UniProtKB/Swiss-Prot annotation:
Induction: Suppressed by juvenile hormone.
Protein name per the record: Acidic juvenile hormone-suppressible protein 1
Gene: AJSP-1
Coiled coil: none
Source organism of the structure: Trichoplusia ni
Keyword presence, Glycoprotein: yes
Pfam families for the chain: Hemocyanin_C, Hemocyanin_M, Hemocyanin_N
Subcellular location, record wording: Secreted, Extracellular space
Glycosylation sites noted in the Swiss-Prot or TrEMBL record: N75, N478
Residues in the signal sequence: 1-18
Principal subcellular localization: secreted
Lineage summary: Eukaryota, Metazoa, Ecdysozoa, Arthropoda, Hexapoda
Length: 624
């Protein structure tokens, strides 16, 4: 068992990544108008593979016209473009998988986002969303609508159903989804017939049963930790609040330091993963070379279109004829970034030099490596990370294409979906390599001076941490929205059978951190807790200057230190936040708020986005 070190650091309230954190997110009054918007938008996500069943929405679908309402949009170009795309049927078909990494798919994403985001009022936005829901690819629609809700001021605070509630097939194997389909057909009358199901209150529960393929590879002894929902969903949330294809000017809510957050989030993920590997005896994260990838993955899933996602065998050979161009692209694009780091500057699209030799330049470097639209030169510093994902996902071959061979048919791998990428060990191999670029840049920065780090009036005397006790417990995922409604259900707009899937999750008992501090004068400080391994996989102590990149930030909070001796206490429940709210709970709350003005609804979705680097990346987080 690897030993971990907990560090406490007291700093003045300034700098770093402190400002996006919100320990106490203010409540948004849930007036009837807001509550109705919440309910209306939630209905667009539920049973998204099926047509609109709500009568009012049917009227909109049949009568609303983009052409006749074009004056209600600020981005007329996007609207006219999308009208032509719909007329000429050059959108991603509803019956094929969607991949945000495909340029043709991404073009429709950006166009539809600009249409919905540029609606001048909420009514136009909502009617347009209803209108396109039944006309476009459901995965694409759900992704775009989520991104718009996050970034429109008049939908701020709207809760977005979790992706596992919308598309449960991404998170459950074929056996589970087949059993769920049988329950959906037979109701609860055959529960006793299936050994994997039982009745719980008004729900039918499917017992957890991992696919036997997970036992075929040593890496999959870690399957429970790879499959944890929360980090996967946070990666998706980041892509919605700060999508790489959306310029900062169009982000009224989430436009702070996207390049730096890009680095920070993935550094947290890799640091956490490394500690979990050490704790489970899996050793170092393998290096990603240019010949063979030892660890394969059998983590396929049934897509919403009943395609099975590609898998990667063990000892996957990159030296294959079909990968030659892609591998050359990867090394060429990586070399351009390495050259820029060595030279101390990047070139913008005009050929002008932009200095990256200062610590603040991590924002520029992050944008360059992500190759997002705010990069100084996206035509030169290209997206090699996505190419890695396509190659290692083993999903490069497009056998059929649509709309005169313009739109490719690609069945994305686990790596190519934000909500599933962390299940593949190749994700961490890619990001170990990418973080090496950031580390190469950081090593060229000037060293901190003692006066920049020291707080001579504050001394940390001692840090005590309670014993950490972990255990597994079950959580329950509602998959009902992914099951088709029968005629009566569609008429009544109510699911007669609620199907839950049992999943194990790692939890821990409550513990406390105590920091004994001596202060010469009263001072307000920012306290940060970090967790890091003390020994590597060979049992050797890791030198601090080498280990710094393995430090994972657990928590940060503002604290008023009194003069003299004091003890800062922090409970684990303060670090991790509350249980995620389910869509059922939000719907019930919104329904009540639509009738009673005195109720209030928390700004739930934005709370998740703004504090994700605290609780979601904790390797022992009790939230799942």
């Amino acid at each position: 068992m690897a030993r971990l070190v907990l560090c406490a650091l007291a700093l003045l309230v300034a700098g770093g990544l402190a400002d996006p954190v919100r320990n106490n997110v203010p409540q948004k009054p849930a007036d009837p108008v807001f509550a109705k918007r919440q309910m209306d938008l939630m209905t667009l996500f539920f049973h998204v593979l099926e047509p609109n069943y709500i009568e009012a929405n049917k009227v909109i679908v049949n009568t609303w016209s983009l052409e006749k309402n074009i004056e209600h949009f600020s981005n007329v170009t996007a609207v006219t473009t999308y009208i032509k795309m719909l007329e000429n049927q050059c959108c991603v078909p509803r019956a094929v998988p969607f991949s945000i990494l495909e340029d043709e798919h991404k073009f429709e994403v950006v166009t539809l986002f600009n249409v919905l985001h540029s609606a001048k009022d909420y009514d136009t936005f909502y009617k347009t969303a209803v209108y396109v829901r039944d006309r476009v690819n459901p995965d694409l629609f759900s992704y775009v609508l989520s991104a718009v809700i996050v970034n429109r001021p008049d939908t701020k605070g709207i809760y977005i159903p979790r992706v596992f509630e919308i598309f449960p097939s991404y998170f459950n194997n074929g056996e589970i989804m087949t059993t769920a389909a049988r329950i959906n057909t037979h109701g609860d009358r055959l529960v006793d017939f299936y050994p994997s199901t039982y009745k719980w209150d008004k729900n039918v529960v499917i017992r957890w049963n991992p696919h036997l393929a997970l036992l075929q590879q040593p890496e999959h002894t870690y399957s429970l930790l790879h499959s944890r929902l929360q980090p996967q969903l946070i990666l998706l949330q980041r892509s919605l609040s700060l999508p790489g294809w959306l310029q900062t000017e169009a982000l009224p809510v989430n436009q702070h330091r996207r390049g730096e957050w890009f680095w920070f989030l993935h550094k947290q993920l890799i640091a956490r993963y490394y500690m979990e590997r050490l704790s489970n005896g899996l050793g170092e994260i393998p290096e990603l070379g240019h010949e063979t990838v030892k660890d394969g993955t059998t983590r396929s899933f049934g897509t919403t279109m009943e395609f099975s996602s590609p898998v990667r065998p063990n000892n996957f050979n990159l030296d294959q004829p079909e990968f030659v161009n892609e591998v050359e692209q990867i090394y060429d694009y990586e070399r351009r970034v390495r050259d820029a780091i060595d030279q101390g500057y990047v070139l913008n699209h005009l050929g002008e030099r932009i200095d990256i030799s200062a610590p603040e330049a991590i924002e520029i470097l992050g944008r360059v490596i992500e190759a997002n639209v705010d990069s100084p030169n996206v035509q030169y510093y290209k997206d090699f990370i996505s190419v890695w994902k396509k190659v290692l996902g083993n999903s490069l071959v497009h056998e059929h294409q649509y709309f005169h061979h313009y739109i490719p048919l690609v069945v994305p791998s686990v790596l190519e979906h934000y909500q599933t990428a962390l299940r593949d060990p190749a994700f961490y191999m890619i990001w170990k390599r990418v973080l090496g670029l950031f580390q190469q840049w950081q090593e060229k920065l000037p060293h901190y001076k003692p006066e920049e780090l020291a707080m001579p009036q504050v001394a940390i005397e001692k840090v005590d941490v309670d014993k950490l006790v972990t255990y597994f417990e079950y959580s329950y995922m509602n998959v009902t929205s992914g099951l088709p409604m029968n005629v009566e259900e569609a008429k009544e707009l109510y699911d007669q059978v609620s199907v839950l899937v049992q999943h194990p999750r790692l939890n821990h008992k409550k513990f406390q951190v105590r920091v004994n501090v001596k202060t010469e004068v009263a001072k307000t400080v920012l306290v940060k807790f970090f967790l890091a391994p003390k020994y590597d996989s060979h049992g050797h102590e890791i030198p601090l200057h080498v280990n710094s990149y393995n430090f994972m930030q657990l928590d940060e909070f503002v604290y008023d230190l009194p003069q003299g001796e004091s003890v800062i206490t922090r409970d684990s429940v303060e670090t991790t936040g509350n249980e995620w709210t389910t869509s059922y709970q939000v719907w019930d709350q919104a329904e009540k708020a639509s009738r009673e003005k005195h109720l209030s609804a928390k700004n739930m979705y934005f709370q998740d986005v703004l504090i994700y680097h605290k609780h979601t990346l904790n390797p022992c987080s009790h939230v799942e």
